[in-house]
């Protein structure tokens, strides 16, 4: 028995409509404040259905409906999975992160729920669509005319519904502007197209803004050595050194704080994704003016061009996002971050033969989720019970928080080991800066992970820990307690620490000059 092409399109539009359940849940929430929620709700629900139907008439012509229909199902179903389970918004920056994700990180999201989701919401519907015997009208002209009529009628129905209730529909969407970011499959497809265009566009010539940079000679008895620890997905809200009380996540660095050799600060991130925050914090641009289309030298380039020895080691799967492209860099991709202790020891040994001002960047894998339980060795499993799966919905809030806190504690241990290496090194005046790229949501208000647009991101995603340690007591005294910092300070602090002068250096943003 054959089914008409138009009936299949109606059924497909209805299924895509159902996959928009996150969108409709947000609509229902917004309708609580509407004067006539029933009429407005019907208008929106019916309007979305007919818009989807008109889209299918355009992009799913006869003979291609099984291919394009399957594509729309895949996009909508997987988008709905991450939106529903992690509270993700699939904007351009998130899609850039997707394009840069390696197999190891992608597999960290694999769990039983995703397998079931794929089976019942992707494979089964696509299998039914492919198995259908669809009745097509003969003749290209006839098929085109019927398809065109279907498009016009469905879009017309949507338009009429909106126009008849425009006095309610238009204000509703103005007051709930984020709804457009939940609509499937349009928003993720639009975001992916923008991300792909950004990745495929030829890189702009590098702006050599460090050309005017100069550096006064270091008259101190010892050269400066700065270890810059670039964190991953650590949020300030989970640092006991910043007032967090559930678990003592800073047990290892506490002695240095007590001895006034180290201090912690709550800082604002530049973004909620590594692909944004890392290039931004090393850039001369502040967060409000940051533009990733501008290809300019960064703080690392300034230091290298003025004679500072620069080394970059990482264990983060995402790499350095272009920041270390023009200096010596090595990424390990190991299971745990303790490989960076060995890297630091070896580099310190190498620098013994050429004692001059130097910076060593250590980029940790840190607290990257959702597989938090894989970020620390078993001996660091101090806080229990834990959530030993990437399906966070299976775990209690207490289990998720304990597991995440173990990752923070492990990073704290690593930092204490880095400091220990600096403490026993007599060749350099050693200092250390630690700052995370962005924070993390652990289920607060139903939101997990990170990556929400900055304007609506919760504090858990935008507030990150900043820590400074130094063997130089005078330097420690110059960094003021109780002062607000952000990643905007990093570029200027790095230049100021090594005495680099440039028109791009702003003394007011240098943490040691405020």
PLM regions: where:
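Transmembrane and membrane-interface helices of multi-pass
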Residues: 1-181
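Alpha-helical packing segments of well-folded alpha/beta enzyme cores
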Residues: 51, 299, 340, 344, ...
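Catalytic cores of PAPS-dependent sulfotransferases
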Residues: 58-67, 86, 302-312, 349-353, ...
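A long, amphipathic alpha-helix that forms part
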Residues: 183, 348-349, 387-432, 468
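Active-site-flanking alpha-helical
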Residues: 239, 419, 444
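Histidine-centered active-site microenvironments of extracellular/periplasmic hydrolases
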Residues: 243-248, 423, 428-472, 505-507
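A short beta-strand-to-alpha-helix junction
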Residues: 290-295, 398-409, 455-462, 474-494, ...
């Amino acid at each position: 028995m054959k089914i008409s092409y138009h009936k299949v399109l109606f059924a497909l539009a209805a299924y895509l409509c159902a996959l928009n359940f996150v969108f409709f849940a947000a609509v229902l929430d917004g309708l609580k404040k509407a004067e006539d929620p029933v009429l407005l709700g019907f208008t929106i629900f019916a309007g979305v259905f007919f818009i989807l139907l008109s889209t299918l008439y355009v992009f799913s012509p006869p003979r291609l409906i099984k291919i394009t229909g399957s594509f729309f199902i895949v996009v909508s179903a997987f988008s709905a999975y991450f939106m529903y389970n992690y509270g993700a918004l699939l904007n351009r920056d998130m899609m850039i992160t997707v394009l840069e994700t390696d197999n190891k990180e992608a597999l960290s999201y694999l769990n039983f729920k995703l397998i079931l989701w794929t089976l019942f919401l992707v494979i089964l519907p696509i299998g039914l669509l492919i198995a259908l015997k669809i009745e097509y009208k003969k003749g290209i002209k006839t098929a085109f005319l019927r398809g065109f009529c279907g498009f016009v009628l469905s879009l017309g129905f949507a338009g009429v519904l909106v126009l008849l209730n425009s006095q309610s529909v238009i204000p509703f969407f103005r007051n709930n502007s984020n709804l457009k970011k939940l609509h499937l499959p349009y928003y993720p497809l639009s975001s992916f197209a923008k991300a792909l265009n950004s990745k495929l566009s030829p890189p702009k010539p590098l702006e050599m803004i460090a050309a005017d940079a100069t550096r006064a000679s270091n008259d101190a008895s010892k050269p400066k050595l700065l270890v810059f620890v670039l964190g991953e997905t650590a949020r300030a809200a989970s640092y006991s050194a910043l007032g967090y009380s559930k678990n003592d996540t800073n047990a290892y660095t506490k002695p240095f704080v007590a001895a006034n050799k180290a201090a912690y600060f709550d800082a604002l991130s530049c973004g909620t994704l590594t692909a944004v925050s890392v290039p931004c914090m090393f850039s001369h641009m502040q967060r409000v003016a940051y533009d990733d289309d501008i290809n300019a030298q960064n703080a690392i380039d300034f230091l290298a061009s003025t004679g500072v020895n620069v080394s970059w080691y990482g264990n983060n799967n995402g790499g350095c996002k272009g920041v270390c492209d023009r200096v010596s860099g090595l990424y390990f991709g190991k299971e745990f971050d303790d490989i960076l202790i060995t890297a630091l020891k070896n580099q310190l040994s190498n620098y013994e033969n050429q004692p001059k001002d130097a910076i060593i960047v250590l980029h940790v894998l840190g607290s990257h989720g959702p597989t938090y339980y894989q970020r620390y060795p078993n001996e660091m499993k101090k806080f229990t019970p834990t959530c030993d799966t990437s399906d966070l919905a299976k775990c209690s809030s207490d289990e998720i928080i304990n597991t995440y806190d173990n990752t923070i504690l492990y990073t704290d241990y690593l930092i204490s080991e880095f400091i220990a290496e600096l403490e026993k090194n007599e060749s350099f005046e050693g200092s250390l800066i630690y700052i995370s790229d962005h924070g993390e949501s652990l289920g607060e208000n139903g939101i997990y992970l990170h990556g929400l647009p900055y304007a609506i991101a919760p504090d858990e995603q935008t507030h990150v820990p900043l820590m400074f340690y130094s063997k130089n007591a005078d330097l420690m005294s110059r960094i003021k307690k109780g002062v607000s910092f952000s990643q905007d300070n990093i570029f200027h602090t790095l230049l100021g620490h090594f005495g680099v002068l440039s028109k791009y250096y702003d003394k007011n943003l240098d943490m040691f000059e405020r």
